Amino acid sequence: MTRYISTRGEAPELGFCDVMLTGLARDGGLYVPAIWPQLSADTIAGFFGRPYWEVAVDVIRPFAGGEIADAELGRMANEAYATFRHPAVVPLRQMSPHQFVLELFHGPTLAFKDVAMQLISRLMDHVLAKRGQRTTIVVATSGDTGGAAVEAFAGLENVDLIVLFPHGRISEVQRRMMTTTGAANVHALAIEGTFDDCQALVKAMFNNHRFRDATSLSGVNSINWARIVAQVVYYFTSAVAAGAPARAVDFVVPTGNFGDIFAGYVAKRMGLPVRTLRIAANVNDILARTLKTGIYEVREVHATASPSMDIQISSNFERLLFEAGRHDAAGVRRLMESLKQSGRFVLPDATLAAIREEFDAGRADETETAAAIRAAWREAGELVDPHTAVALAVADRDTTDTTVPSIVLSTAHPAKFPDAVEAACGQRPQLPAWLDGLMTKSEHMKVMKNDQGEVERFVLSVSRAAKQGVAG
């Protein structure tokens, strides 16, 4: 069995299935594997040209540690990626001799979150059914995670899903993907606050152990290790398509909660030859500032055209602190306590140096983001969403070394942000025909104050696990 440990060192070690159902560790930390599995260069090279779901099985298998049979994992991966509307699942497009764009938006809700969510919903339902358990999933979303979770978990017998999103701070398409499902096990809550407020509510509920146990609480934000593992796969498939492992590659990743780019770090730890992981931030640039100064300091969140990155508390950064700090859990606890008390912490010199060896960072403001949307349309005839545009703007600043392929992650379909795209380049992206009815369906949502007690009471009222007393 693969063992998982908490970044804060005070929670029990767990196996893969328990980590997936647990989400946040009971000490407030995040789970990571005690030892990183390795893939040989021959194994990685062998991924070339294989179906995406087969590569997913080979990448995920060592993390599952024998807890899920290969045949079951293969069946669920095949089903999950059959929901995507491109034969390659996540196609890699060449934009210039050395720059590629990895399209992660061909899933049911047009965002990269579908890649992990379509698989994790099947994995969770499979494990719950085998154990005869139900769970209550509470998820915070800055826009895309919620829609992907609703699509993936709607109608499942063993799961109740409650989605928290910042009221008035996401696009209409994003909101409607959460509010129009009609499934009895799905509940959308518009919280009067920011995404960071929503995420803080979810963490507070996990840290209320009596409530957590009563509802059999679980989470599918990227605090959940299974989400990260599922995203590792496309780093391998895209890098191999661009020439790895015979040559190294760079990745440029639109970054908010640090989950997607951390999956790239995991791929590198497993043996993928990645030269640089570049964080692309909008004006909410806490991670870019941290890499520059060594000080992680929360500032006011500014609403932008790339709302999924309008974040100041990047949860998955804690996983990197733990790894870069050589598994110093006490050190992580000190940093997180400082963040909680003062809204800032100073990175130890050795930790900062270790992070800078693997990552660099850039930011793009609203003007630069709009210019990148215009440039993609003018030069390549491509409409790109604002998050992808941030990454393109950051990538295009460093074009001195053209020997290493640069892969920009395109995380959402432009039609999820039609107003921003049209304002930038004059072209309005259209939703795919199969989503025609989305904008006219009736919505079901509840506006709620940023109040932990009020949210917990609502969750208790809809949780079948709580009502049946089956929390385990």
Positions of PLM-derived features:
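PLP-dependent amino-acid enzyme catalytic core
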Residues: 1-472
